[in-house]
Amino acid sequence: MLQETRTANTVAMPAAAPDYHHIRRAIAFLTERWQDQPSLELLAAHLGLGPTHTQKLFTRWCGLSPKEFVQAITIDHARGMLEGASSLLATAHEVGLSGSSRLHDLFVTHEAMTPGDYKRRGEGLEIAYGFHASPFGEALVMATVRGVAGLAFVDEDKGQTRAEALADMTRRWPAARYVETPAQTAVHAARIFEPAQWRVEQPVRLVLIGSDFEVRVWETLLKIPMGRAVSYGDIARHLGAQSASRAVGTAVGRNPISFVVPCHRVLRGDGNLGGYHWGLTRKRALIGWECGRVRQS
């Protein structure tokens, strides 16, 4: 059930948000032409910008030059991100989500709804939602009184509309009541997308709504630090279900809280990107942006 209650958004958009239109086009171009190693001048011409403007665009958006960004999304770099993944998950289990190695990452706390709540498919649940600018395109943020329940992106590469992005999320919990209150969700959006607001004393609160197995997979995703990656098989082994890589892949694909629950940090075992519900261009953007964050920290 949808109900509109529009109120003003008084929270400033993330500083990098206006740049994503150009960044998205640049990533698509670089992905198609990477074997040719296109020059800065060629990339700038494709974007309709000058070389200096293009260089500053990338530096402002992620702290990397275009050349460094391309290196961050290569398969060789991805394989490096996967090194030691099994021990990484084990170590993360010991130190939790606020260890010193995660000081450049978003801080979160989470709780999971009971299996009974999940089976009711959102019945009796009110979910506020709003659309907000982000460094990765327009984001749909959804929250209950207990915390953020959903975060999606409007997929420009597929020509997706806001209504289609909303429908993609509401079908997960069809019995819930949905109220458009962007002033409420803007606070969550700012804490998620503005690194200056990433503080251990003010973590983003999440509520995970899924099956027991899905929640276990999503909790494992929360253990992957920024700048690192694991494979679907690594997650299956960590959960003691070595033969369940396919089921893990399905659960990763059903993650309703993108970016915060970092399903983009899951790759195939050979370093290939695999899939991403909100498009591979955006997955590359997330990986490259996070590489820049790690280098700056």
Model-assigned labels for residue ranges:
Residues 1-95, 101-243, 291-297:
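Basic nucleic-acid-binding alpha-helical/helix-turn surface characteristic of O6-alkylguanine DNA
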Residues 142, 275, 288:
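Short beta-strand-to-turn element immediately C-terminal to the catalytic PLP-Schiff-base lysine
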Residues 279-297:
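Short, basic/aromatic-enriched C-terminal tail that caps enzymatic domains
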Residues 243-285:
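Short glycine/serine-rich loop segments
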